[in-house]
Amino acid sequence: MILVTGGTGLLGSHLLLELVREHNEVVAVKRPSSDLEAVRHIFSYYTGEVEELFRLIDWVDIDLMNYAEVERAMIDIDQVYHCAGLVSFQPRDARRMTEFNVQSAENLVNACLETGVDRLLHVSSTSTIGRAPEGVPANESMIWARSKTSTSYSESKFKSEMEVWRGIEEGLKAVIVNPAVILGPGFWDRGSSSFFRLVARGMKYGAPGVTGYVGVQDVVGAMTRLMDSDISGERFILSASDQSVTEIMEMVAETMGNPRKMKAVTPRILRNLIRLDAIRSVFTGRRTLAPELARSAFSQTHYSSEKISKAIGFEFTPIGEVIRQVAVHYLADHSD
């Protein structure tokens, strides 16, 4: 039996679909307030048997911060996919995010060890990969260290990884994946999926910052293949290609039938937008442009996926094809 955390998110919902399609017994962790209709909608992109497959999932309400609840959920579980995690670049969320990301990982690792779970797959992020020398793509051997440009999110994910490495030292069979920015259909109002909404609404600005991108189905494919292997005590970068924000936005615009060159946002423009956003937040109570996130708009990081390719012969879908597939679903969802 397989337990999945974070099953109501972009990655988790795609993973659940793959697992039930392969006739696995699946337990999915959720909060009482979780929106399961969003998961059903993800399923509908790929199958006409939404309800039949959805009924195969045993949904359970569990507080991942409560160790006793987590341990009880592990009874009869063979494999655990830990996809849950908070993502925020707002300073006000840093403490809560770090507490949840680290404590949930600690509780899951301890419960896996206590109940004898066979394998754990932990979803981390490329943000925990250390900085590479100029001109060299970052790889799994490069260790994260706090710096002026690091974010609270990257620190929380690094500390979460440390819990998994601690579990491995104590005898747990576990593997870690470090996906780049994940592109996939659904959840159009948040995360990387909002690229499509922004372009559809006429966004004209891009940014020179470069990072890795990967399709959600590739991430799921790599995860399940790693879980089915004997590999343990390793982490793997999952990145199809490195692109600038401008390049991604222009690919999205072209695929959605409205090709255009994006104007380059400058540091001065961005600083002014951040100041305006700070003033606006006095009235709204929420900042949209966090300084941490804004800094990444001009940073350039390249990643190597050579390790996963050599380990299991994994091949990534070209990011242009991923964008084309996602755009089809965006346009279908907004055809009215």
Residue ranges of predicted features:
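Conserved NAD(P)H cofactor-binding loop of Rossmann-fold oxidoreductase domains
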Residues: 84-87, 124-125
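Mid/C-terminal beta-alpha module of Rossmann-like enzyme folds, strongest
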Residues: 223-289, 305, 310, 319-320, ...
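NAD(P)-dependent short-chain dehydrogenase/reductase
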Residues: 168-216
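Substrate-positioning beta->alpha
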Residues: 159, 190-191, 207-227, 234
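Active-site Tyr-X1-5-Lys
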Residues: 149-175
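N-terminal Rossmann/SDR dinucleotide-binding element
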Residues: 1-79
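Conserved Rossmann-fold NAD(P)-dependent oxidoreductase catalytic core, especially the SDR/UDP-sugar
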Residues: 94-95, 99-152
